[in-house]
Amino acid sequence: MEVLREKVEEEEEAEREEAAERAERTEKLERVTKSAEVSREGTILSQDELRDLEGKLMAIEIPTQADHSVISQAPVDVTKLPPSYTTNSLKEEHLLLVADNFSRQYSHLCPDRVPLFLHPLNECNVPKFVSTTLRPTLMPYPELYNWDSCAQFVSDFLTMVPLVDPLKPPTHLYSSTTVLKCQKGNCFDFSTLLCSMLIGSGYDAYCVNGYGSLDLCLMDLTREVCPLTVKAKEIVKKKEKTVPKKYSIKPPRDLTSKFEQEQEEKRIQEIKDLEQRRLKEEEDRILEAEKAKPDPLHGLRVHSWVLVLAGKREVPESFFIDPLTARSYSTKDEHFLGIESLWNHKNYWINMQDCWNCCKDLIFDLGDPVRWEYMLLGTDKPHLSLTEEDEEGLDDDDDDVEDLGKEEEDKSFDMPSSWVSQIEITPEEFETRCPSGKKVIQYKKAQLEKWSPYLNNNGLVCRLTTYEDQQCTKVLEIKEWYQNREDMLELKHINKTTGLHVDYFKPGHPQALCVHSYKSMLPEMDRVMEFYKKIRVDGLVKREETPMTMTEYYEGRSDFLAYRHVNFGPRVKKLSQSSVESNPRPMVKITERFSRNPEKPADEDVAERLFLIVEERIQLRYHCRDDYITASKREFLRRMEVDSKGNKIIMTPEMCISYEVEPMEHTKKLLYQYETMNQLKNEEKLSRHQAWESELEVLEILKLREEEEEAHTLTISIYDTKRNEKSKEYREAMERVLHEEHLRQVEAQLDYLAPFLAQLPPGEKLTRWQAVRLKDECLSDFKQRLIDKANLIQARFEKETQELQKKQQWYQENQVTLTPEDENLYLSYCSQAMFRIRILEQRLNRHKELAPLKYLALEEKLYKDPRLIDFVKVFV
């Protein structure tokens, strides 16, 4: 009874609450009705006000929800598309039914999950399964054989269009051919094209439908460091510990105070700690300022990317590729917040794992049906093996297993072939890449600009501008990449802070220039030139120049010269204006160093040679012997050949100061010193001349570089028929000559009067008598040729008839002795002979019928010939 009483009380209370709600709704309705009546009474508009309001309303444009922005801006002619775009085959219709059934089961089992992205509409508004939209294609360009180059091409070639609804996948998914034609698309279009190219190149690639961060979905790289600015880590070589020799000299005892050293080290460490703390605070402040604002849709933004699994193409580890930016990420990267499903050209998988920790804990074993639910049977991914207990349980009922196997075989369904046409990229499209030939990407404190080749007159294809601040207002440095330059310029690096310019060249420059570093193109300024040593005859590798010095480095010379350093003095001022070439800088000192010549003893092999030109001295230092500490040295006092009175100066021992490592082995006589002195004088002249030639070469290179920068001529391959003007003009001229020759041949073939006109003298005008004679000769000649042709056919006919009669007579005479093989040969011959006779008879009869008609037709043409019409019209 108590339970019944409680139920009655509950029902009464529910009825009271319902009545109260009904009364409240009635009051609200009355209140709204009264306010509407009041507002209606107070807002009566005049005719002018109504017209103004109508005009304002007509001016308002309401944006329509259409996520197929590619088609809306670049309409596609549906009539020119293949039938596979506009209709579905029976197999595709069956696949759509299977997909719908799969989606219903998934929604029933997982009601909290979003609907599956299975069969969006294509550009013809026909539903197509996502796996059939993939068209594996191997491009004919070797550059597109690797994943990084494929991703970079897709990122450069297409323009990103954001999803209309960032929380839902698009309702349309276009074919890659349409996307390539329009050169724009959303992230799903990007990933579909990239996945098709990667699968065609042999990668185990999949399109992913998931969730990404705000920067990833909007292709925002302003918080990412540009890959071109990341410097390669220098490998620090570890110094090998030298084992001290047993009898080596011990270092002197260190008498400094260890306490003072420790105090100094503590002080230095405190300064370092303060500096590190200050830098850490500055970095934290910058990171806090650059930190992105919290995204209210974090974890809900839909994004599509490409998954590449390890295994194929020697991929060691699975990774993600963002097709919008062509950057690769680890599968544990924080930019990727979750995965709903993924697919390739063979199957479709649903992620059954929890993504509470983004994608960090996901296991990409597509053969595990617990983690990845597949849609179609017969996938190429291996399934998990059964345990022994499961196998024993299955062995108990063999019939059920067989029936189950039959059912599975019946339920298996192969993926239909792709409905997309063959993906083709023309050489022009592959070369142009970027839409309209240009693309700009904004990175963190950097801006990257790309151009297609030959778009800029100077060959510029890429420019990277690095800035000091986050707002990109103060330029730090500029890097410019060039292609197809005649001067082989490849890269320009400009440092705006120091004003240093560095030009990099490919092999092939007229002066074998490799790197040119300078601050000014004026001569006798700070600059460094590096050369390709294998191209230079003199083995010059590097040349450093300052206003007062010039240093050259050599390799591989026959005289073993490795280094030359020239010191210049102040230039002597001349009254007349003179150029740098006519008034060179005076040389004060020349230092030359040589590599070891193994064919000479160390005491005779010069290691360093100094020409002190102003002091008139020459210093020599020889190579050091093995296991020796010091080396032999000599110094020559270079004097004039004659003194002030004109007397010849004789070589004296005081003019050569020498230090011998082993003076007892051999002593150099005065004659040897005199000959060495004369040889060094000649070598000094040669060194000064070579240094002067180096100065002239620098001036020549600077002049050449100025001309090259002003002209910036581009090279064009002989195989580029569109841009190569010389080749194009030559080809057009040849085609024109061939066409004219063909016309002449045709005219000669059709000119029936040509053989008769050739008999007349050249340039002579026709008379009436000659015209009539030409006409009669042409007709008589044609009549004779018709008669000759009839006689030829008649002669062949009579010959074939006589041979057949002879063969028949031979057969009648030898009929008794013939074998069956001979009879077969005879019958075959008779059949062929009768066929030839019949054909000749038909040709002869036809010729007799057509000969008069041909004669009359030629006669009519001659009467109408412009060369004879004025003379023979009287006789018509």
From Swiss-Prot:
Tell whether Cytoplasm is among the UniProt keywords: yes
Please give the residue ranges the record annotates as the region Disordered. 1-40, 385-412
Recorded phenotype for the gene knockout or disruption: Male mice were infertile due to their short immotile spermatozoa. Axoneme formation and manchette removal are impaired in spermatids. No morphological abnormalities seen in multicilia of ependymal and tracheal epithelia and cilia motility is not impaired in ependymal cilia.
Give each disulfide bond as a residue pair.
Answer: none
Q: Which domain of life is it from?
A: Eukaryota
What keywords were assigned to this record? Cell projection, Cilium, Coiled coil, Cytoplasm, Cytoskeleton, Differentiation, Flagellum, Spermatogenesis
Gene name as annotated: Drc7
Source species: Mus musculus
Q: Where is the composition biased (Acidic residues)?
A: 387-407
**Role description:** Component of the nexin-dynein regulatory complex (N-DRC) a key regulator of ciliary/flagellar motility which maintains the alignment and integrity of the distal axoneme and regulates microtubule sliding in motile axonemes. Essential for male fertility, sperm head morphogenesis and sperm flagellum formation. Not required for ciliogenesis in the brain and trachea.
Q: What is this protein called?
A: Dynein regulatory complex subunit 7
Family the entry assigns: Belongs to the DRC7 family.
Tissues expressing this chain:
Abundantly expressed in the testis and is weakly expressed in the brain, thymus, lung and ovary. Expressed in ciliated cells.
Provide the transmembrane region boundaries: none
InterPro entries, per the entry: CEPT76/DRC7_peptidase-like_dom (IPR056290), DRC7/lobo (IPR033551), DRC7_C (IPR056292), MORN_DRC7 (IPR056291), Papain-like_cys_pep_sf (IPR038765)
Q: Where are the coiled-coil regions?
A: 1-33, 258-295, 679-710, 784-809
> How is this protein annotated for GO cellular component?
cytoplasm; cytoskeleton; motile cilium
**Which portions of the chain have biased composition (kind: Basic and acidic residues)?**
17-40
UniProt keyword Coiled coil, yes or no: yes
